[in-house]
UniProtKB/Swiss-Prot annotation:
The lineage of its organism: Bacteria, Pseudomonadati, Pseudomonadota, Gammaproteobacteria, Enterobacterales. It is found in: Periplasm. It is an enzyme of class 3 (hydrolase). GO terms for biological process: nucleotide catabolic process. Its EC number is 3.1.3.6, 3.1.4.16. It catalyses: a nucleoside 2',3'-cyclic phosphate + H2O = a nucleoside 3'-phosphate + H(+); a ribonucleoside 3'-phosphate + H2O = a ribonucleoside + phosphate. It holds the Pfam family Metallophos. Residues 1-19 form the signal peptide. Belongs to the 5'-nucleotidase family. Two kinetically distinguishable active sites for the two substrates (2',3'-cyclic nucleotides and 3'-nucleotides) have been identified. One of its GO terms (molecular function) is 2',3'-cyclic-nucleotide 2'-phosphodiesterase activity. This is 2',3'-cyclic-nucleotide 2'-phosphodiesterase/3'-nucleotidase.
Amino acid sequence: MIKFSATLLATLIAASVNAATVDLRIMETTDLHSNMMDFDYYKDTATEKFGLVRTASLIHAARNEVKNSVLVDNGDLIQGSPLGDYMAAKGLKDGDVHPVYKALNTLDYAVGNLGNHEFNYGLDYLHNALAGAKFPYVNANIIDVKTQKPLFTPYLIKETSVIDKDGNPQTLKIGYIGFVPPQIMIWDKANLSGKVTVNDITETARKYVPEMREKGADIVVVIAHSGLSADPYHSMAENSVYYLSEVPGVDAIMFGHAHAVFPGKDFADIKGADIAKGTLNGIPAVMPGMWGDHLGVVDLVLNNDSGKWQVTQAKAEARPIYDAAAKKSLAAEDSKLVGILKADHDATREFVSKPIGKSADNMYSYLALVQDDPTVQVVNNAQKAYVEHFIQGDPDLAKLPVLSAAAPFKVGGRKNDPASFVEVEKGQLTFRNAADLYLYPNTLVVVKASGKEVKEWLECSAGQFNQIDIHSNKPQSLINWDGFRTYNFDVIDGVNYQIDVSQPARYDGECQMVNPQAERIKNLTFNGKPVDPNATFLVATNNYRAYGGKFAGTGDSHIAFASPDENRAVLAAWIGAESKRAGEIHPAADNNWRLAPIHSDTALDIRFETSPGDKAAAFIKAKGQYPMKKVAVDDIGFAIYQVDLSK
């Protein structure tokens, strides 16, 4: 007993002598989407609102504030802007370094994680791109089909030299682990099927985090390309961060994917979220928006009084590069990065400036959420023409009527960017304009759907709208921004229909039925006659929608054929062909859908948000199908319009 006490005392004395406190800052970029420059290639103009060359200034400043810091990237890096398109079209030869890594390699990243869009161009292209990174990558939940082992390094434990508060050198063993949404197997099935599988994020964390601790990790940093949702836990969830915060042994969560900002007011209602501290169930967590518009910062205080390092204090914040309220830049350009990127930037501008045709009219998406719209119409026209030509030699498919589904991709972001609208001017069109009209490198896929499934597909799309109370004279918001993503608001061309927003939504934002008795889709017709529920249609869409199985009429069993061509390339080719045939395209909407008139004895005050600009105001005045009046500008900068749906 005396021997034991002496040993214990010696241990305590040693721990006391070696006790130290370390401040550690962890910084994060995420969802850069190849926006390296502070430049909007779609508008061919500089911007202060996004771009890594400005985020870099925040990185330098944040580093200079502290003794100890590390920087991580959370994926969706190589795709998403014309720079990414240019590089994918050009290809990567042995030894080529992708421009995103020319930039990131100068900023001393400790580690990177993969996002879902890393797989858009296939595994070979991804591996060639990653070869240019001078920092390691982690991902724990992608499994190689052949080896049944992780395709990438699941986690890393990096010995990191730090300085404690007394000025003494210390060594921290920082563990990093990365995750990607399992849905990549749906979204990029053509690139991944038969090559990899993907495991559940939370279950994978529960497997590896204890192992990381056993192998000596002093702290564990989770880098999750996944969003935050308080929905009940279910396996293979896309947005798993809430449940990652409950995994024992996790010290910090750097997350993304949702293009939102945490800590932020949009997440104030989530149980366990402390917006002031930037914690989730007590764990510091940060999600720094998109395109480099924020830098994520987690600050930890670590102490080893007990003989092992423990987090004693923690906080997180997302630092913006632009003050939207004051309309003021908060970050200057990093001139070194600008110089490094100049050649690729210039080549990208040249790439997107190649003429493809002409347009007889302007194409703006200011009203795309409230009425049929030219920016969606031209996509549907192109997809429909492509499929009708493609099936001519197939006797089984050629007899089926062709519809086309497309959604507005640029209608204010996630109600976080009043400048994010399609603005294509009449006259000469370039590839830049095609990329503005169709943002993503999706491929065209055709599904077979019954008339009943077409209606249910549209019922899910109609979840884009809030229900209007016909007895209330208070202001009512028309657009369901919080519960529905605008890229899921499919307009199906080839049929005619109305959407009755006085009725409750039949489906939620995930196309799960919530009101079985509700019906918003009215007067659904094909060639002037009610759609036969048992009729079969071909519906042109994209690989995300077709393989997703979320909407009625989609999923593997419904695939009629998968095109090798990108929807955007189909659009560009159609613009070229139509311009050659007719001299120019005529992008007017055919008005195959509209919001059904609402009859009420109450003077309704229905409102929607759109661009605040004079160009938008003029367009709305000239093209609005319903009486509309601008009544305010909200705190984000969106114009608020009152719309009369009584007619």
